[in-house]
Amino acid sequence: MKYIGAHVSAAGGVDQAVIRAHEIKATAFALFTKNQRQWQAAPLSTEVIDRFKAACEQYAYMSAQILPHDSYLINLGHPDGEALEKSRIAFIDEMSRCQLLGLSLLNFHPGSHLKQIEEADCLARIAESINIALAETDGVTAVIENTAGQGSNLGFRFEHLAAIIDGVEDKSRVGVCIDTCHAFAGGYDLRTEADCEATFAEFDRIVGFRYLRGMHLNDAKSAFGSRVDRHHSLGEGNIGKTAFSYIMKDTRFDGIPMILETVNPDIWADEIAWLKSEAQY
């Protein structure tokens, strides 16, 4: 079974994200549980939590179908001790919010060395940040997203993801989300079925499908291997539709949230319908 949806707005409250997902006939969705561009957020009230859980029950969304995303400000590999601590506190808060909402996954970008420390040091800091957050929370899996490798962002090589996982003590609570645009921009080709076979074989060899907890299904405005993060609508960009059809037909991608972050929300319902048709249900 494929869970297919989009990253929907939580404007007006996190329960509104559930309603918006239902309106586009999504069987999965992503959301921010707080403003993604601010450090501080009001704690989740009992009323807000209850409304969210009631909406999920009403529209039949289980936690396995929901892939919340953390704040863009957080850098779990920050070279500066004070800034790193600020990010770690914020990440624990994000994990705690997921726990309160009954959510089992939290998707995040691994971090950036800001050209101030070595890659290996940054990756070790990210792993330690995850260990700290897992020790402070229960029931939520930290889901590392591959990046396009813009600037000094790490996570654009599968080896980076494997190194982080290697440093995480509780392997049962760490996973990976593959963003197709990021992978393509990071140098993993997806334009043909043979490309998909090779890229996902490489992923399985280096990281392992056992760690796959989600997908971001995005075409790319950016060129192959450009390390530029620019999403596009499915079939409109440089990846093309073949990869998305391939993913829909491959059972290795069953049972995880598959999230559109494509550039035109007006056609999300159409994109979801097409993906469902490719998955043949």
Curated annotation (Swiss-Prot):
**Catalytic activities:** Endonucleolytic cleavage to 5'-phosphooligonucleotide end-products
Q: Which gene encodes it?
A: nfo
Natural source organism? Pectobacterium atrosepticum (strain SCRI 1043 / ATCC BAA-672) (Erwinia carotovora subsp. atroseptica)
A GO molecular-function descriptor: zinc ion binding
| Binding locations of Zn(2+) 3 | H182, D229, H231
Q: What is this protein called?
A: Probable endonuclease 4
The protein's superkingdom reads Bacteria
The record's comment on protein family reads: Belongs to the AP endonuclease 2 family.
This protein's UniProt keywords: DNA damage, DNA repair, Endonuclease, Hydrolase, Metal-binding, Nuclease, Zinc
